[in-house]
Amino acid sequence: MIFKKTILIFIISFFFISISFASSSSSSSSSSSSSSSSWSSSESSSSPAPSKYIYAIAVIENYKQQQFLIIDPWENNTILSESLQLNFEIDDILIVEESNTFIVYSESTNQSLISINPNTLQSKLINKITPPIAGFEDMLQPSVFISEKKVLYKPVVDINGGGELSSLLRLDFESGKGTFVNISNENQISTAGSIPNVAYDQLNDYVFACYNSSNNNVLVAFNETTSDIIETYGILKNIQGFDVTMMFTDKLGNLFLVYQDNSGDVFVCEVDSILMECFGVFKYNIGTVPYAFSPYFLSRDKSSLVFITYIDENQFLLEVVDFNHGFKSKKTIFSNSYLNNPFNVYWVSLTY
């Protein structure tokens, strides 16, 4: 099982926010072929890069130092690097609001929702869960934060009662209450210690969960407001034997799963809930991953997948793949020179 590490941790969120700067302009990119039945690979564009920054918080030496970074990967430049003087540990960057205020999650002060002003670097507690929820192991799968409800879903392993069942922890920061959501049923019990995945369909107010049961991927949907199970779709037949690593919905509510094989290929497939199959729409090779972070995650606006892949000890390749427009992509190479040791980096937050 994968749990939080307390070595050099790099909590990083790639919030590609529309921040204007003079040297860039928006443009179209060349398309890659895609269909619902065949894999597509990304194709780069020669047009100018979008005007977007990387926002990151580097946590060094067991939280002795937390560093705030703004990086422009398209110009290969560090815009800002400031030390944060905080009395809590940041475990996840959830969103960056239009005002550029950070909303972060911390478990060092119960389960807390906190805002950080990027100009003053001052923090403010929004709310915390009282009493704190205990009896779980925090998993490094992507969380889902529903900002308009102030609700956070975290994939966890529930160790209450001596078991190790994968579950979802629902943290409601409006009410200050936290609950476990049981995503398995009596016929398909989740494999002990397996890592669940979660996605939110804002259009229909559904939460989708996917978990492993006896080497099968089981899909479940429930109502976010009531937590009532809407449907247990059952086993996705054509991806048996693969571990799903991420799931997401697009703006129309279509559900996508991400999984990878041992050769470094990452597959994105769209779920057909009638046929109970997941049809391949995109493939990306991440190659060898000599570092301890996930090289892909979802954009904040649900428009793109972002891939960070290793080139050499001094450089990373950033590629933004727009799945709402035929999987067109933008790519650039940026330096990791702002890190002390990139091979000791761990990315906890994979929001965007």
UniProtKB/Swiss-Prot annotation:
Residue stretches of biased makeup (Low complexity): 25-47
Gene Ontology cellular-component annotations: extracellular region
Annotated glycosylation sites: 76, 110, 182, 212, 223
Signal peptide location: 1-22
Region ranges (Disordered): 25-49
Location relative to the cell: Secreted
Key words, A-Z: Glycoprotein, Secreted, Signal
Protein name as catalogued: Uncharacterized protein DDB_G0289171
Organism: Dictyostelium discoideum (Social amoeba)
Lineage summary: Eukaryota, Amoebozoa, Evosea, Eumycetozoa, Dictyostelia
